[in-house]
Structure formats: structure tokens, C-alpha cells
Curated annotation (Swiss-Prot):
Residues 56-76 are annotated as: Disordered. Its main location: cytoplasm. It comes from Anoxybacillus flavithermus (strain DSM 21510 / WK1). The keyword Cytoplasm applies. Pfam families: DUF896. It is found in: Cytoplasm. The keyword Kinase does not apply. InterPro entries: DUF896 (IPR009242). Keywords: Cytoplasm. GO terms for cellular component: cytoplasm. This is UPF0291 protein Aflv_1503. Belongs to the UPF0291 family. PANTHER family: UPF0291 PROTEIN CBO2609/CLC_2481, UPF0291 PROTEIN YNZC.
Length: 76
């Protein structure tokens, strides 16, 4: 994930944007930090999903095929 300093800066810029607005440089920094945050979040979510196995009440593996295929691609 993103460092706590970067997350704090994202929150600081969001708060400032609501109160008084951002300069052009701050707006660019905010966009760049948010892009980094979203990329880190997506990578983390994909790793979490690759650890998931869906089992129905009868004990059958009903993991979606798309997820199974994604897991196989990751291993190769």
C-alpha cells in the first residue's frame, strides 16, 4: 500500500480543496497521489481475490472461471 505520509497528504489536499481551493501545482500533486493510491489499492485487491476460493453449501468449488484463469496466469 501507499505510505502513511502520502495518504496523509491526499487527505490534507482534499481538505484544503474543500475549504479554499488548490493551486495548479497542488491539483497536479493531488491527481498524481490519487493515481498512485488507486493503483496500489487495485494491486492489493487483485492479490486478495487470488487468495479466494468460493465453495457452495455442498462443498463444491464454484469459483468463477475468470478468477481461476487469472490465478493460472499469475502462476505462469
Amino acid at each position: 500500500m501507499l505510505s502513511s505520509e502520502k495518504i496523509a497528504r491526499i487527505n490534507e489536499l482534499a481538505k484544503k480543496a474543500k475549504i479554499e481551493g488548490l493551486t495548479a501545482e497542488e491539483k497536479q500533486e493531488q491527481i498524481q497521489l490519487r493515481t498512485e493510491y488507486i493503483a496500489a489499492f487495485r494491486a492489493s485487491m487483485i492479490e486478495t481475490l487470488h487468495a479466494v476460493k468460493v465453495i457452495d453449501p455442498n462443498g463444491n468449488d464454484v469459483t468463477p472461471q475468470k478468477l481461476k484463469d487469472s490465478k493460472k496466469k499469475r502462476l505462469h
